[in-house]
Amino acid sequence: MSFSLTFTELANIAIPQCGVLNFKALHLLLHGILEHIHMAELKKVLSGDEDFLQTSQVVIMPREGDAQPILNPMKRLSNVFDHVVSRLDKLENQLALLQDLPSTAQLLEASQGTARPVQDLWHLIKLRKMVEGHDEVMAKSMQTLQDLLTDLHALQVTITALRKEVDMLKNMLDKVHPERMDIFAEDFKIQNWKMVALQREVASLQNKFKTIPKTEDMVLWSGLHDAMFTSEIGSSPLDLWQSVEQLPEAALAQTTKYLEATRAIQVSEPVQNPQLLQTVWHYEVPELLPEGSSAQAVSLSRAQEPAQPPALTPESAPGCTTEFAPGPAPGTEPVPGLELGLELEPVPALGPVPGPSVTPGSLPAPWPVLGPVPAPGAQPPPLGDWPALPRRWPLPQGWPRVGSWPLWDLGVLRPTQPQPSRAPPPATEFGSLWPRPLQPYQSRQGEALQLAAVQVKGEENDVPSLRGLRERARKDGAPKDRTRKDGVPKDRGGKDVDPKDRAHKDDVPKDRGGKDVDPKDRAHKDDVPKDRGGKDGDPKDRVGKDGAPKEAQPKAPQSALHRLKTTAAIAAAAAAAYAAATSSAAQAAKVAAKFVKDAPATKMAAIATDTAAAGPLGVFADVLGAGPSRGATESQILGDDSEIYEILSPSYSAASIGPDPALSQAMVATKQAMSPEDKKRAVKYSMSHIAQIPVKHDSLKEEFAQLSCNLNQRLSYLANMGGPSSLGTTVDILQKKIGSLQKSRLKEEELERIWGNQIEMMKDRYITLDKAVENLQIRMDEFKTLQAQIKRLEMNKVNKSTMEEELREKADRSALAGKASRVDLETVALELNEMIQGILFKVTIHEDSWKKAMEELSKDVNTKLVHSDLDPLKKEMEEVWKIVRKLLIEGLRLDPDSAAGFRRKLFKRVKCISCDRPVEMMTGPQLITIRKAHLLSRLRPASANSCEYLQRQQMREQQWLQLQDLGIQEDCQQDWGDGPQNATSLKCKSCNLLTLYPYGDPHVIDYDSAEVDILGVDGILYKGRVNSQRGAQPLAVAKELAAVKAPSPPSQSLYDRVHSSALFGAICPPLCPRSSACSAASGPHLTMPARPPSLPPLLLLPPLIPSLRDPQQAPGSTRLSRAPHIESRVGRKPPEEPANP
């Protein structure tokens, strides 16, 4: 089937596109052209040197006998293609060899001569590997390139979005008002200060929360009561209250070993005033007072010889101790507390030693050398040294640790072997009134200071007070834990031991305790002594019964004198020790009271302090030995005998007076408190007396000073008077008072130690209670807050029925379908999170620059004018704006006298060439060309290019139609911050701007009707008129236009002309807030008119001059916002084109 084609169609088939050639179709086309022009038979002469006629370099030499080849041009031309074909065949063969590796047989066949097929094969294999590697590298490179392109695309999208955000931020920044920024800055500062204060409050609250103690750290009234009134030493049989209640009973038991008898002494010689002993002795006091410890007998005796000074017997001499015989002595009743089980050790014979002097001078030692007793009339031994102490003998078992207290030692007596040649006389046991801490033994420092005591032998005077004390002691009886019902004492293990056996075990002389005497008989003898049964009281019988050799009795004045000296020395030492102990107790009490006062001022501490102000040591006045019940009397002047006998009457000689019954009952009630209220009152009652100790100490010191003064006066008066019948009674009374003072001092020490520990404990408890009260107060405040929140929640709680109904409702599937899935939400949340993180990162990066911008902005804002200064300027601006608005609405009109542009002025300042001085010269006229859509005088000028011109013409018409379709809405205002607003709509006349002449009078030359040359945007001069289709403008508008010259930059290039048109279009935007929002939503074609692709984009800028606003303006918005620079908003400028001629 044949068909026909035109040569054009055949040419299109031969060359369908660039780079593609169909040789057959081209061959057919060329032959058809040759036949059509009749050139098929024509010939072309060739020189033979053409390139396409050159044959291959491989020349096939003819063999011998062959004919020479005939050179044919056509054959030579065909050989060129044959050579190419052979080369292609060779390449195909080599490629086939490369694809399939040669076999072993092929390698053997090829291994001939210099051929190296194996080496070639190895090179081929390496080449393949290299090619494969390059292939992989290229594939990886392409993949990386694709990834980079993908990332670049994502980056481009991000940059586009960022540009939009930046533009939006710029718009927002343009709308920011300086006065609002000031308000926001002030609010921010206030909020910052509030946050700092809130942080401080939170820190303080955290510290307060940290100080809240735990429950176990809180102390209740019951725990405080248990800590104060419960003994912590279980092994001790006595506590504070037992010591308060039992000590008076122990004092009663001590009276059984008091002076058995005193004899009437006749004074026949004068007695000098005695010198009191000014020495302080140290001894060790146990920390606790075991029960029955105050009933020890310390027998002090003396052996009196004719013409010999009174001396101590070996049993009572310094350095010796009284044997604690468990058996009863003749004429005495067993006293509890004597079974101490001390091992008596022999001591070397005592030689002459110097004793403590009674007078300021030195006297011979008042005791003899152990051994044979010197005969009557012997001289006193010479001065010597104190006996060396072999070693310390151990303390009695069961005693606690000891402490050293400055007190008078009644005699550090050494255990000695009793002398069989002498029987101990009846001892004047005034030491039995002293409690157990006065038990003599070696001090810690090894001191051996002794006091010379006088032992009186013979009959005792019948003292009614002593008989009464004995009878009271017999009625009270011995303690049950130490004595059986039949009166036989028990040993430490609780077994009944015969007194005889015990006496032999303890090495007591048979003379003293060797006889077995029935306890009843012994008690009867104690009750009614036979020695005192006679009226005369013959001393001879008493001495005989005692078993001691009858010796000459000393004279009465010596006995009275020495007894008086001994009593005075005892009283002085006791007074000094009592004063020292009282001062130390007062100091400790002051320190404790200070600690208590320094404790946190809680309610309980305040009540305790107020209660403690009632008086110092009021409840313990009688117990501690103060007051008249303990022998303290006011200072009196001893005038006559009647006062002496009245003061020394037996009514003041009571050695043991029970404590105040009200006090004992209060203590018992305090200790037995059970309920919390009772314990609270007990603690307050006890604390009320702690602060009274210092004041009471002062009163005790004053009373003691009065007692010392009275004692000195009495002793002086007794020494001067020398009353024979009252000396013994006075000494006994003084001894009783001294014993009572000593017991009171010991009680003070015990109470001081116990109360000191309790004060420390109470101080710690007070601190803990104070913290607990603070924590409770804080928790109460938190509880109140929580309670208010609970009430608020109860008021705002959700209705249960409504909530249940909402829960019962089924979900709508269509509504659920329209909702996003969780995966999408999570993805969006992740993206938002990343975006927020990026924004925060950018914010942190640009924070410094923002701060600087804020500082500059604040500086600029601070330099703004005041509202009152801007009022005149505002009025002027409104007037100018009215004129400009009219000009913009009616359109620009040519003013020959106006300037040509921004850069060209009416007068140009130049300099003279010859003299170089400034000269003002008028500038020449200059054409100002602005783009206009309807500038063509005819549809197609002769010089215009058809395709390009038509395209531009169509695009201009479309742009003009779009600008007309925008539609300027009436009654629409533009939002320009706080500036004035105008309801009048502005018509955009920017596209009506034409070519203007800078000079000339429009009245003289009618530019509206005259035909002028106009330079078009395509660079071609056209003939046309200035006025538009609407007709000429009124004359008033032209005058206003001449008066107000609108600034316009010179348009030297095409871009400048377009920029000037866009700028004039941006000066008067016709959209109000509503219309602008609608136009923004309608799409980009409303906000950006169509433009030719060769022109740069037209930027829509905010208006430079705000529209008028209603008179009712917001307060604080009087500042005039500055218009941004036009040059900074337009963007970059392309390179300028050469100026138009």
From Swiss-Prot:
Residues 74-101, 145-176, 757-810 form a coiled coil. The keyword Coiled coil applies. Residues 296-339, 416-439, 455-561, 1105-1141 are annotated as: Disordered. Keywords: Coiled coil. Residues 417-427 have a biased composition (Pro residues). Residues 468-553, 1124-1141 have a biased composition (Basic and acidic residues). Pfam families: DUF4795. It comes from Homo sapiens. This is Uncharacterized protein C16orf96.
